[in-house]
Amino acid sequence: IVTAIDSFKGSMTSMEAGQAAAEGIHRVDVDAEVIVRPLADGGEGTVEALVSGMNGTLQKVQVTGPLSEPVICEYGIIESTKTAVIEMAGAAGITLVSDEERNPLNTTTYGVGEVIRDAIDKGCRRFLVGIGGSATNDGGVGMLQALGYGFLDKDGNQVPFGAKGLKVLEQITDTYVLPELKAVSYTHLTLPTKLE
């Protein structure tokens, strides 16, 4: 028997949920062979699921959180393919912001770009990015700022973090973009849906 259960946001990881199911199965049949595997939909738990299933390693890096505070973000590297596995939720996730502070006008994806930058520095050129669980609505502007893009107001200054910066955006520049980005490929991971 294989248990593969997605996380329960803010209360139980995928592995904890799978282990709880395995314990329930063993109460009914102590001899049952149960294998617990992580599962994720692109949000919380994506790094754990993919790194575990692909024999990767976990990395930790301090980045700018959704409210510009320092946070420690965990991501994975699959060394055999120089692939980084990143969760937007780890650097810009809704669980990093208290209920009282949740305001997409003020939250940024800058930390996601910092994670990408760290992985590039470690030799990664392929990226699997889970975009679920975000506390942001800046269109990825913060992430791109961290990678060297300029998002400028009418006076030539960087726009403020968060969706509020989009209102004053006048110009986008690529003068300081990391040159390594030309050799990078991305795949975004989201919950699959079926439209009927």
Which stretches of residues belong to each language-model region?
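Short, structured active-site "lid" loops
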Residues: 51-69
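Anion-binding (especially nucleotide phosphate/pyrophosphate-binding) glycine-rich loop
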Residues: 70-136
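Structural motif
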Residues: 1-2, 33, 58-59, 82-86, ...
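N-terminal phosphate-binding or glycine-rich loops at protein starts, especially the Walker A/P-loop
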Residues: 1-51
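Glycine/threonine-rich beta-strand-loop-alpha-helix active-site module
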Residues: 106-110, 114-130, 135-182
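Glycine-rich loop at the start of a catalytic domain that most often binds anionic cofactors/ligands
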Residues: 47-55, 75-78
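Glycine-rich beta-alpha junction loops
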Residues: 40-43, 67, 189
